[in-house]
């Protein structure tokens, strides 16, 4: 009798534990996201990271139920964090052949035009990247433009941070500055350099992405990519872009 009661008790306990296990919600996935200060894609506003790519990422994460934080760092550190942390991601990353196998890719989050900026008091005759050969071009550590120009044999002067390049250009230490059109133009306007430094030649157009550590689950990457497709279709992405375009024109 006791044995039978013990067996019944074990069955009941087992069923209760099974039900509890089924009822327990799975923890929400968490991503540690890093980026650099590069307006209007990612920048500090009212104490938090905002911007075109940033706002798109936040919407997609919230809709997918993914908890996350976004931290501004110098690009080299932001990039390294995504490589080293199992739940790490970085944006806005150009999807180059050298980087392809290092990450799992989500997006695109935005697009960028790469432009050579030069001093306004010089006369420029640059209709192709080949015309810039022999000129000293300013870049910064870890940036895709740096490796792009180096791989094509251009003379590159690399700084630890992109903000050092406009002063170097004005001082005559470099001939040109390889920048993102929007981010570079924003830097010039904010610092009063937009009459002294001007766009000379657009040398590439690229899509940029949220690049995630290889340990991030494929199912999560697929869900987030679907989220980016959705915000493109339903107009959310364009609404975010227009909001920042209006801010730029209202300055």
Regions found by a protein language model. Give the residues of each.
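Ligand-binding clefts/hinges and TM-proximal coupling segments of bilobed small-molecule sensing domains
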Residues: 19, 67, 144-160, 195, ...
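Extracytoplasmic small-molecule ligand-binding "clamshell" domains
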Residues: 24-102, 139, 243
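Periplasmic-binding protein-like
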Residues: 35-37, 112-115, 189-225, 229, ...
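Extended ligand-binding regions for polar small-molecule ligands
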Residues: 54-63, 136, 143, 211-247
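Short helices/loops that flank or line small-molecule/ion binding pockets
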Residues: 62, 71, 76-88, 104, ...
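Short beta-strand-to-loop elements that line the ligand-binding cleft
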Residues: 67-74, 139, 154-168, 199-200
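A ligand-binding cleft/hinge motif common to bilobed small-molecule-binding domains
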Residues: 80, 93-102, 175-204
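Flexible hinge/capping segments at coil-to-helix
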Residues: 118-137
């Amino acid at each position: 009798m006791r044995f039978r009661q013990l067996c019944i008790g074990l069955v009941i306990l087992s069923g209760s534990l099974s039900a509890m296990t089924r009822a327990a919600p799975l923890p929400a996935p968490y991503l540690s996201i890093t980026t650099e200060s590069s307006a209007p894609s990612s920048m500090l506003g009212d104490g938090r990271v905002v911007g075109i790519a940033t706002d798109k990422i936040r919407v997609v994460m919230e809709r997918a139920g993914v908890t996350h934080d976004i931290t501004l760092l110098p690009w080299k550190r932001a990039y390294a964090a995504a490589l080293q942390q199992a739940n790490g991601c970085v944006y806005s990353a150009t999807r180059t052949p050298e980087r392809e196998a290092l990450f799992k890719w989500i997006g695109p989050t935005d697009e960028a035009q790469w432009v050579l900026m030069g001093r306004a008091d010089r006369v420029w005759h640059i209709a192709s990247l080949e015309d810039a050969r022999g000129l000293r071009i300013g870049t910064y550590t870890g940036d895709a433009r740096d490796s792009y120009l180096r791989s094509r044999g251009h003379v590159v002067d690399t700084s630890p941070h992109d903000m050092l390049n406009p002063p170097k250009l004005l001082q005559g230490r470099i001939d040109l500055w390889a920048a993102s059109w929007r981010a570079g133009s924003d830097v010039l306007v904010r610092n009063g350099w937009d009459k002294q430094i001007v766009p000379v030649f657009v040398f590439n157009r690229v899509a940029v992405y949220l690049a995630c550590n290889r340990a991030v689950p494929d199912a999560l990457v697929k869900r987030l990519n679907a989220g980016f497709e959705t915000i493109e279709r339903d107009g959310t992405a364009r609404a975010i872009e227009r909001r920042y375009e209006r801010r730029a024109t209202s300055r």
